[in-house]
Amino acid sequence: MLSPKKQKYRKAQKGRVASKAKAGTMIAFGEFGLKSLDSCRITSRQIEAARRAAVRCMKRQGKFWINIFPSIPVSKKPTEVRMGKGKGATEFFAARVAVGRILFELDGVSESIAIKALELAGAKLPVRTKIVKRYE
């Protein structure tokens, strides 16, 4: 699973996900891409599950790119713990994804396999997604 090697701060504030993506809205590497239609926080486990589903469908042919990185530590307190006593420990890492952001890209496979792989990957994510083609 993806996680940052080094962090400036151990814990982060909750923050908000931007409504529309300012960068990362165009396909940069591959021929096909998976674009988000909602804004959301995606965990490193969800990214890994989507990657595995897509790569398995591609039968390890072609190339697969992940365009998002879970760099935000999300902390959580244990259940049935009273208020106070500081912020909880880091539970997982997440990536903030805005509307219009390209999440994954792939290349080197036929269009039918690419669409099927990206549909499987999109099913593993908590956002609505759309498959886009380069120059479309």
UniProtKB/Swiss-Prot annotation:
GO biological process, alphabetically ordered: translation
Gene Ontology MF, one: tRNA binding
A single GO cellular-component term on record: cytosolic large ribosomal subunit
Family: Belongs to the universal ribosomal protein uL16 family.
Protein name: Large ribosomal subunit protein uL16
Quaternary structure, from the entry: Part of the 50S ribosomal subunit.
Record-annotated disulphide pairs: none
Gene: rplP
Organism: Orientia tsutsugamushi (strain Boryong)
NCBIfam families: rplP_bact
UniProt lineage: Bacteria, Pseudomonadati, Pseudomonadota, Alphaproteobacteria, Rickettsiales
Function field: Binds 23S rRNA and is also seen to make contacts with the A and possibly P site tRNAs.
Pfam families: Ribosomal_L16
CDD domains: Ribosomal_L16_L10e (cd01433)
Entry keyword set: Ribonucleoprotein, Ribosomal protein, RNA-binding, rRNA-binding, tRNA-binding
